[in-house]
Amino acid sequence: TFWSPNVNIFRDPRWGRGHETYGEDPFLTAENGKAYVRGLQGDGEVMKTAACAKHFAVHSGPESIRHEFNAEATQKDMEETYLPAFEALVKEAKVESVMGAYNRVNGEGACASKFLMGKLSEWGFDGYFVSDCWAIRDFHEHHGLTKNAVESAALALTAGCDVNCGCTYVNVLAALDEGLVTKEDIRKACVHLMRTRIRLGMFDDKTEFDDIPYNIVSCVEHKKVSLECAEKSMVLLKNNGILPLDKNKVNTIAVIGPNSNSRIVLEGNYNGTADRYITFLEGIQNRFEGRVIYAEGCHLYKQKVSGLAMPGDRYAEAMAAAENADVENLKIGEIASQLSLQRF
């Protein structure tokens, strides 16, 4: 299973995980999400991989209090904004898995919500439900929905959460002994999981996806499609006639900023490893025939780059680079892997 795509709605730029999503529009999110799921799961005799629609539901920040936050949404907001993408992925793309969110939704824990589970049933969901990691533990530690881990495990399992990412389900047998769950509850969850494994061909002697070599995964054709996707996805918010650069007038470009020559910034989070990385600086150096000046300018989140230096130890370098260039290319921002979950 790949715990992706993230089809939450992104409408506040302060949400540190917004870059994982498809943006603020429910329709566009649904369309992109469906294509992603179909690409992951394939259409062969066995399922290529199991995709996962997350985080169900109303998970769009604030990130710092996600473990105890109660998202209050009207029926109108649920139907028009927060649920359409999930519904489309279930009904049209046949997504194999759905992941519950950390937060509560109108008072109910998302991983044990009668309302949300009812929606999945209404849509004809035929896969398995998984909690976000340690979300079920939040029931008793942060949300106050239960008194202890045994009750939390029982609440989630009986509601329809088949898999617990975390350790709370080690208490399922204790819940069975206390009469909080039944053997049928456990059997039903196991059936859902085994059904997915069968669809993935895990019990077959051999499938068409067992031995795909890296030279196929990273072939020229695939790279061309990735490049086309990147080019068509870019949005130029403001130009004022600067681009494209006039080669006859521009002799020197200053590339400034802590993200200019960073390979980490290209990765995002929950990332794989590419066979090639080209930083912003390297890309400009490769394409521009004139002079390229580089200055780090500052640290991403510290007041200085060098440990023994005074604050702002790279400012003068950046100013000098800018003063000696015809065009300045500034790369600032944050690195996804270091975005603090304790912010908004």
Each predicted region: which residue ranges?
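Glycoside hydrolase catalytic-domain context in secreted enzymes
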Residues: T1-F344
